[in-house]
């Protein structure tokens, strides 16, 4: 009798999980990750466009470094307010704001005839993608059942990779102005499609919009689904968060939040200081510096980015976060060392043919390793580890820190390469080694655990 009850419970659970995967959930996720696609395009646009923009507008290396990095300054500014904005106007409205900024930014870049207009466009792109980097993972986490949370959250990284790949590939065939115009299409698409997806149920509950909350859940879970229990749980969670006063930046540094804060900030710092942003922004120059055809090199990178991201998206809820992060960091450590070694041997005039092989193997391995872990999982973990009463403040701080670390690397990379190409990648390899130790000692496994379980365990460890 007991076995029959257990079997019935398992069957009901399986049916509930299967029914949670609906066309409404898929549509909503597909629409919001169009913003992630735009983010990827913006990140890597500077790589294929560099030589032509510098030539046609007469820019120096310092000018172009600032143009590339000014987007991260814009991202930093909006990241500070991203949590407050999305809480005030809603997740969908925040995405509309980001789309307007991105469309204006791309048009300004496309029609720029001087450095001021070019930088203005890039700055507005930063404003847009700064909002995207916060609101997209938050919206996906709030609409997705825990069974699919990791995979659906990773679709954010998948579409970023798709945007990066598109720039690497099409940059070989299109003029930089045309490339900027094409990059505005995802934002224009999202502006229209946002009308057809629901607002986040959790945000609706925050403002007491009970009827709209149930309508939103019906769209996400299916018209025939029983959403009353989930709606009640959302209302209860929101009510608890109201009783726990929303904390400010000072409360975020309370001892109980220390472990979560170290994990969030640490992962963002190490993600950037491993050199990932530099490869996205300057891939063509990296190949040119090593004497390898940049059009062939960037095409190879474009081809490998998508399959590995799809594999991770489908397996992250099965394998877990920690194993993928460890594999990712180990791979990046080894591959950065190989890239540095190839530059070192080339500079000394040794094994020239071998250097090209080592470079392409190192870069392909690095990009693949980054994509399976450190590329997207820090954002997934960020959405899981902070208690609800500090989530807005913590999310804004961690997002801003990511943009700040990103700016440091992107602005300094050209100067680091001029100083020592091999030394630059040996430094990145060393940071990747530190990342391995950091993940092993501090980052918990969050697979298959509720947000409450994750956060309670971290508070105990603080």
Curated annotation (Swiss-Prot):
Subcellular localization: Membrane
Annotated SUPFAM superfamilies: MFS general substrate transporter
UniProt KW keywords: Membrane, Sugar transport, Transmembrane, Transmembrane helix, Transport
Pfam assignment, any one: Sugar_tr
First-listed, main subcellular location of the protein, grouped into a coarse class: membrane
Stored InterPro entries: MFS_dom (IPR020846), MFS_ERD6/Tret1-like (IPR044775), MFS_sugar_transport-like (IPR005828), MFS_trans_sf (IPR036259), MFS_Trehalose_Transporter (IPR050549), Sugar/inositol_transpt (IPR003663), Sugar_transporter_CS (IPR005829)
GO cellular component, one term: membrane
GO molecular function term, any single one: sugar transmembrane transporter activity
Membrane topology, from the record: Multi-pass membrane protein
Function: Sugar transporter.
Family: Belongs to the major facilitator superfamily. Sugar transporter (TC 2.A.1.1) family.
Name recorded for this polypeptide: Sugar transporter ERD6-like 2
Species name: Arabidopsis thaliana (Mouse-ear cress)
Lineage, broadest ranks: Eukaryota, Viridiplantae, Streptophyta, Embryophyta, Tracheophyta
